[in-house]
């Protein structure tokens, strides 16, 4: 996030999350390492962000893997108004109640009409939905766009999806009247940053971060 010009702070303590949200311009709720304590913090943070009209992004990491995660995400979506859900196809399927075979935090396997399901979820929860994969998909429930590009090596690095969610939160925090276009630009830049000729995962991760910084500098 620092590479793209954002200034992050990570907080999951119940006694401070509302204060942290109060001085923030966006909130990312990521359930990657969730437990009962952090689940309470997520709810408090989301409610405070809604109160202050601060944009919120949900990254439902591995939501289809366990009933605990599914129930938590359902509760979050019921009680918090999100601006964006950023997920992979498997996570989208779990949120929508579609049949899918999850594989940890990875997308897993299954067959759904991503565009149709994503648009339904977008309308149901009144937020943008981004589904990432070989081709990224974004919708506001009415408009939709596919973004291609990038390299398969990105799928071999843990955290690239979580990083994208954080950058999307920064994009929403930047304001502007056309949030959909801002998010589309973010997705295109992210794909472009992943278009490298490196063959090794370690080299790819390093060059990926360098490229993100370069793109951020160009857009200043």
Residue ranges, per PLM feature:
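Short, small-residue-enriched loops and turns at beta-alpha junctions
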Residues: 34-37, 62-66, 137, 154
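Short, small-residue alpha-helix embedded
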Residues: 94, 157-188
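Charged C-terminal helix
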Residues: 186, 190-220
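Conserved N-terminal subdomain of the carbohydrate kinase-like
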Residues: 2-58
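Glycine/small-residue-rich loop that forms an oxyanion/phosphate-binding "nest" at active or ligand-binding sites
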Residues: 38-87
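Short pre-catalytic strand/loop immediately N-terminal to key active-site residues, enriched for Gly-Thr
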Residues: 145-158
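Conserved phosphate/ATP/ADP-binding segment of small-molecule kinases
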Residues: 69-144
């Amino acid at each position: 996030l620092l590479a793209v010009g954002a200034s992050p702070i990570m907080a999951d303590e119940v006694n401070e999350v509302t204060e942290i949200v109060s001085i923030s311009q966006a909130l990312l709720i990521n359930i990657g390492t969730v437990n009962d304590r952090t689940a309470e913090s997520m709810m408090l943070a989301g409610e405070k962000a809604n109160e202050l009209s601060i944009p919120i992004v949900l990254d439902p990491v591995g939501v289809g893997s366990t009933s605990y995660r599914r129930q938590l995400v359902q509760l979050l979506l019921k009680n918090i108004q999100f601006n964006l859900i950023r997920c992979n196809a498997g996570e989208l399927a779990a949120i929508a109640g579609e049949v899918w075979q999850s594989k940890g935090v990875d997308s897993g396997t299954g067959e759904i009409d991503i565009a149709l399901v994503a648009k339904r979820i977008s309308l149901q929860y009144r937020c943008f939905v981004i589904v990432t994969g070989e081709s990224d998909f974004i919708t506001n429930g009415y408009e939709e766009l596919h973004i291609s590009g990038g390299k398969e090596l990105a799928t071999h690095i843990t955290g690239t999806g979580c990083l994208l969610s954080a950058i999307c939160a920064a994009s929403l925090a930047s304001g502007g009247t056309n949030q959909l276009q801002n998010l589309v630009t973010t997705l295109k830049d992210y794909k472009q940053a992943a278009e490298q000729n490196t063959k090794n995962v370690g080299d790819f991760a390093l060059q990926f971060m360098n490229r993100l910084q370069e793109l951020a500098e160009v857009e200043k």
